[in-house]
C-alpha cells in the first residue's frame, strides 16, 4: 500500500478530507504520482513566476484555455491559496517540484521553502486527472492508473497563442482506448472545460508532431493494444514547454504527473 493510500484510510477514520491528508503526505516527503489519489477532488498543475512575468502569463492562459485553464492564483508573495484548500501551502503540498533558471530545470526538490520569494505569483491550472474519475465511473479504463505509472505526455506541433515572452507548442496527455470508449470519453470530458475538456486529437500521433508514441517527452510510456486508439487531451504541462522556450530567469513548476490536490470537488466542475 502506498503512503497516499494508507493516509487516505487514516483520514477517513479521523474525519479529515482525503485531499487535505494527501497534502499532508506531501509535506512528509511522499513523492508518488497523484493519479487516483483523493478520488472526487480536483487536482492542479502548478506554475510559479516572478510578478514581472505574471500578467503576461495570465494573458497566455486566457488565450489558451484548453491547455491552461486557471483554477486558482495566489496573491504576490503569498504561498497560501485558501480558495483551493484548508491550510494549503503551495511551497510544501505537492510531491515534487521543478526549479527553472533561464529555461532549464536545475533542481527537483520535494518542497520549495528555500526557493520562495516575496515577488512570486502561483498559478494553479486544471488537470485531466480530475475528469478521470468520470471516465472510471463509466467503466472506461485508464491505462496509466492500471499500470501504476505517470500519464504519458508529449510536445506537439499544435501552436499556442503567444502572449508577451510566452509562446510555444501545446503539450498533450495520452490515454489509449478502444474506439467505442474514445467516443464516450469525448462526450464525458466535454462536460469539464475547466480541466481541459474534450480531446484535441484522436489517433495518428505523427499528424500532431509525435514521432514515437513509445517515447513520451514527460511521464511514462504505456502499452497500446492493436485494437486501441491513442486519445490526446490538452495538458497543463504546456506552461513548462513555454517557460523553457521563453528562458524565464526563474520559475517553479510541479514535476509532471505529481500534482496539487485541492479541496474542490470534481462534480462542481461539470457544466452539464
Swiss-Prot record:
Keyword Lyase: yes
Alphabetized GO MF terms: lyase activity
InterPro entries associated with the record: D-Glu_cyclase (IPR009906), Putative_hydro-lyase (IPR038021), UPF0317 (IPR016938)
Keywords attached to this entry: Lyase
SUPFAM superfamilies named in the record: PSTPO5379-like
Domain of life of the native organism: Bacteria
EC number: 4.2.1.-
HAMAP family assigned: Hydro_lyase (MF_01830)
NCBIfam families to which the protein is assigned, alphabetical: PRK05463.1 (NF003969)
Family: Belongs to the D-glutamate cyclase family.
PANTHER family: D-GLUTAMATE CYCLASE, MITOCHONDRIAL
Protein name per Swiss-Prot or TrEMBL: Putative hydro-lyase RPB_3621
Organism in which the protein naturally occurs: Rhodopseudomonas palustris (strain HaA2)
Taxonomic path: Bacteria, Pseudomonadati, Pseudomonadota, Alphaproteobacteria, Hyphomicrobiales
Amino acid at each position: 500500500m502506498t503512503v497516499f493510500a494508507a493516509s487516505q484510510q487514516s483520514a477517513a477514520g479521523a474525519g479529515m478530507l482525503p485531499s487535505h491528508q494527501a497534502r499532508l503526505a506531501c509535506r512528509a516527503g511522499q513523492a508518488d504520482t497523484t493519479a487516483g489519489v483523493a478520488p472526487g477532488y480536483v487536482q492542479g498543475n502548478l506554475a510559479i513566476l516572478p510578478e514581472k512575468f505574471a500578467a503576461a502569463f495570465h494573458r497566455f492562459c486566457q488565450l489558451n484555455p484548453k491547455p491552461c485553464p486557471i483554477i486558482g492564483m495566489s496573491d504576490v508573495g503569498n504561498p497560501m491559496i485558501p480558495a483551493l484548500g484548508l491550510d494549503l501551502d503551495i511551497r510544501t503540498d505537492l510531491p515534487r517540484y521543478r526549479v527553472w533558471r533561464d529555461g532549464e530545470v536545475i533542481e527537483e526538490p520535494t518542497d520549495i521553502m528555500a526557493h520562495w520569494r516575496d515577488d512570486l505569483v502561483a498559478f494553479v491550472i486544471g488537470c485531466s486527472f480530475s475528469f478521470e474519475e468520470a471516465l472510471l465511473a463509466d467503466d472506461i479504463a485508464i491505462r496509466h492508473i492500471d499500470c501504476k505509472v505517470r500519464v504519458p505526455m508529449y510536445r506537439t506541433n499544435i501552436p499556442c497563442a503567444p502572449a508577451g515572452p510566452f509562446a510555444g507548442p501545446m503539450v498533450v496527455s495520452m490515454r489509449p482506448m478502444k474506439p467505442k470508449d474514445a467516443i464516450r470519453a469525448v462526450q464525458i470530458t466535454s462536460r469539464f472545460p475547466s480541466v481541459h475538456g474534450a480531446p484535441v486529437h484522436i489517433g495518428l500521433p505523427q499528424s500532431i508532431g509525435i514521432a514515437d508514441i513509445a517515447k513520451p517527452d514527460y511521464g511514462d510510456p504505456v502499452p497500446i493494444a492493436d485494437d486501441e486508439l491513442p486519445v490526446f487531451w490538452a495538458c497543463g504541462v504546456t506552461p513548462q514547454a513555454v517557460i523553457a522556450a521563453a528562458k524565464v530567469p526563474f520559475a517553479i513548476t510541479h514535476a509532471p504527473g505529481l500534482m496539487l490536490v485541492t479541496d474542490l470537488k470534481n462534480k462542481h466542475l461539470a457544466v452539464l
